[in-house]
Amino acid sequence: MAGKLWTFLLLFGFSWVWPASAHRKLLVLLLDGFRSDYISEDALASLPGFREIVNRGVKVDYLTPDFPSLSYPNYYTLMTGRHCEVHQMIGNYMWDPRTNKSFDIGVNRDSLMPLWWNGSEPLWITLMKARRKVYMYYWPGCEVEILGVRPTYCLEYKNVPTDINFANAVSDALDSLKSGRADLAAIYHERIDVEGHHYGPSSPQRKDALKAVDTVLKYMTQWIQERGLQNDLNVILFSDHGMTDIFWMDKVIELSKYISLDDLQQVKDQGPVVSLWPVPEKHSEIYHKLRTVEHMTVYEKEAIPNRFYYKKGKFVSPLTLVADEGWFIAESREALPFWMNSTGKREGWQHGWHGYDNELMDMRGIFLAFGPDFKSNFRAAPIRSVDVYNIMCNVVGITPLPNNGSWSRVVCMLKSQTSSSPSIPPNSCALVLILLLYFV
């Protein structure tokens, strides 16, 4: 019954009264595929940019992503504070059988349809509605009109941003924040994720990508001082998920060996989580055949574990396959997502992946923050991706929409904790009582 009550509150726009902090500017950096141990205490010794940020601000032990530990679901979880089954962005690849439209990791035209994005209101849209100004750089979805609104400025993602692109975005964002053109600036950077996929999370290439980011961050702290923003700007860095090693030589599950692909209406994605829409009369047969396959679990929709906060999503398929860590599900070996390596052909093997059970250690991400509202040299306990939204709302001084995050997990990061916790006004207390009587 508690779940029904929460759904009711979300649907009808119930929100808490939020005594917000002073309205300061915010710079957000989303570093894709950044695993928590990339900035372990030992690693920080050779990362002066990150080390300075950690010494000046807050570092959590790790951030647990939402399930599935994929990019688009967590992009939206981070910016809404809601689980995937609430905001509806449940995968990098989705299909809507009612309209026969597909979302293919944001690259196809149909991915821009409101169908996929209007399930929840992300922070940048809330700020725009409040007449705040938002600048976004390479951020997936900033080019989309969501609930009839777009950000003030969107530098659209076209190709993987280079290290120079990232540095230029940081510099331009700081200029925009200093001049008053922006109240929030948000920057997405992907290279750590790309190198982790291609070469593996422990590879020299991934480590080089991290060092390049570290160099930009070292300059960023200098640029903040040069622009006189140190007393008026909070900076938050986080990742969407981690990365683990995969081995295509001997850890691939080929669906074509167990079922006829002609018995499927649709297949979406490959890797740790695969969505299947069987021809209706073949559903039971396919389910029972796949139940015997080792190193993966097949779930009918209602049997998906509640802890994933996934199965109530409207785009969730009748059958969901979840691989064991390090295993990769594909229709066949020929259909594996090879990448274009130095040969100029798509024949490069992937050596890292994510999307697995979100509680696995290798799926953990990062959260760092510094600025006038955050404590200095503070280590915080682990948080979850749903928690990030509340802390962002607080430091920009805006009331958060109803969400799944825990304020108690993040309030410890702030210098001032006495006036920042959510409270319920008297008239809302009466509403809660009525709802409890109705639902319980």
From Swiss-Prot:
Propeptide: 420-440
Catalysed reaction equations from the record: sn-glycerol 3-phosphocholine + H2O = phosphocholine + glycerol + H(+); a 1-acyl-sn-glycero-3-phosphocholine + H2O = a 1-acyl-sn-glycerol + phosphocholine + H(+); a 1-O-alkyl-sn-glycero-3-phosphocholine + H2O = a 1-O-alkyl-sn-glycerol + phosphocholine + H(+); 1-dodecanoyl-sn-glycero-3-phosphocholine + H2O = 1-dodecanoyl-sn-glycerol + phosphocholine + H(+)
Principal subcellular localisation of the protein: membrane
Transmembrane helix is among the record's keywords: no
Modified residue annotations for Phosphoserine: 71
Cofactor comment text: Binds 2 Zn(2+) ions per subunit.
A Pfam family: Phosphodiest
Activity: how regulated: Inhibited by EDTA and EGTA in vitro.
Membrane topology, as annotated: Lipid-anchor; GPI-anchor
Gene Ontology molecular function terms on file: glycerophosphocholine cholinephosphodiesterase activity; glycerophosphodiester phosphodiesterase activity; metal ion binding; phosphoric diester hydrolase activity
Transmembrane segments: none
Name by which UniProt lists this protein: Glycerophosphocholine cholinephosphodiesterase ENPP6
Binding residues for Zn(2+) 2: 193, 197, 354
Lipidation (GPI-anchor amidated serine): 419
InterPro entries on file: Alkaline_phosphatase_core_sf (IPR017850), Phosphodiest/P_Trfase (IPR002591)
Signal peptide span: 1-22
